[in-house]
Amino acid sequence: MTENTKTHVILLSCGSFNPITKGHIHMFEKAREYLHKTGRFIVIGGIVSPVHDSYGKPGLVPSRHRLTMCQLAVQSSDWIRVDPWECYQDTWQTTCSVLEHHRDLMKRVTGCILSNVNTPSTTPVIGQPQNETSAIYQNTVNKSVAIKFWGKMSESLGKICCVRPHMDRFTFVDENANLGTAMRYEEIELRILLLCGSDLLESFCIPGLWNESDMEVIVGDFGIVVVPRDGADTERIMNHSSVLRKHKDNIIVVKDEIDHPMSIVSSTKSRLALQHGDGHVVDYLSQPVIDYILQSQLYINASG
């Protein structure tokens, strides 16, 4: 497959990130590596979307802290960014609504072709960029081309930073412009996939926890990339849910022959390590995140 015929993917991870750990970043990296190895996908960006303060989880620190920690955790990455939209809303948003927001945002801002899992590639949806948004293409030697789209993102200001392999410049499509018969559109299929661990996948099997229509949209329209933790049996998990069984082909399980130590890192372990003064916290959290936590006195006296 050529680069333009491969499915271009943005990985979106929703969660508390309380705090964000090295395991979260490892999940992004492993998913991108695995998707590239399949030869069917090109991962052009990753989005970290922390949950709203009203989520109600015990011990959840305010979003201003979680957003800052997430930004510190990804500051050295050239393809993962933090998105504050979910935190800036008036109330908690479902995972389904977050996915739909980013799909609609990409249509408006990037001008790329957005499609659901079940959308035929012969009938792509072409996004129309906003007039005030310009694209900056930065070429680097032996690296991907970083594309940064600046502008107003819904009701908040932010940045979309996507990375993709070198290719000819993408043609933005303005349906209101008189482009003439000579204009050719470069069609690049773009999908937003939910990135998660096996614990979130298993939560789909808990009766009443998820709205079934939301599950249909998440798994059936968008699709999921699962990075298993602690040797979880994803096959068994999927067989316990009718929705997961129905859309099994839309669930990509990242297979790894080697159990990486980052796969057992969790926010809970990190908080406990902080509370107990455990030096192993450096194995769980990046140093900038640790420094911020200590400076802000987070989690030190919190429970769980």
UniProtKB/Swiss-Prot annotation:
Residues where NAD(+) binds: 16-17, 92, 95, 197, 199, 209-210, 229
One MF term in the entry's GO annotations: protein ADP-ribosyltransferase-substrate adaptor activity
Pathway where this protein functions: Cofactor biosynthesis; NAD(+) biosynthesis; NAD(+) from nicotinamide D-ribonucleotide: step 1/1; Cofactor biosynthesis; NAD(+) biosynthesis; deamido-NAD(+) from nicotinate D-ribonucleotide: step 1/1
Membrane topology: Lipid-anchor
Lipid attachment site numbers (S-palmitoyl cysteine): 161-162
Substrates-to-products reaction catalysed: beta-nicotinamide D-ribonucleotide + ATP + H(+) = diphosphate + NAD(+); nicotinate beta-D-ribonucleotide + ATP + H(+) = deamido-NAD(+) + diphosphate
Gene3D superfamilies per record: HUPs (3.40.50.620)
Enzyme Commission code: 2.7.7.1, 2.7.7.18
Pfam family, one: CTP_transf_like
Cofactor note as given: Divalent metal cations. Mg(2+) confers the highest activity.
Cofactor(s) this protein cannot do without: Mg(2+)
Main subcellular location of this protein, as a coarse class: Golgi
One of the protein's GO biological processes: NAD biosynthetic process
Residues binding ATP, per UniProt: 24, 268-271
Entry keyword set: ATP-binding, Cell projection, Cytoplasm, Cytoplasmic vesicle, Golgi apparatus, Lipoprotein, Membrane, NAD, Nucleotide-binding, Nucleotidyltransferase, Palmitate, Pyridine nucleotide biosynthesis, Transferase
EC class (word): transferase
Location of this chain's protein in the cell: Golgi apparatus membrane; Cytoplasmic vesicle membrane; Cytoplasm; Cell projection, Axon
Transferase listed as a keyword: yes
Cellular-component GO terms for this entry: axon; cytoplasmic vesicle membrane; Golgi apparatus; Golgi membrane
Quaternary structure, from the entry: Monomer.
Job description of the protein: Nicotinamide/nicotinate-nucleotide adenylyltransferase that acts as an axon maintenance factor. Axon survival factor required for the maintenance of healthy axons: acts by delaying Wallerian axon degeneration, an evolutionarily conserved process that drives the loss of damaged axons. Catalyzes the formation of NAD(+) from nicotinamide mononucleotide (NMN) and ATP. Can also use the deamidated form; nicotinic acid mononucleotide (NaMN) as substrate but with a lower efficiency. Also catalyzes the reverse reaction, i.e. the pyrophosphorolytic cleavage of NAD(+).
Family the entry assigns: Belongs to the eukaryotic NMN adenylyltransferase family.
UniProt protein name: Nicotinamide/nicotinic acid mononucleotide adenylyltransferase 2
Gene coding for it: nmnat2
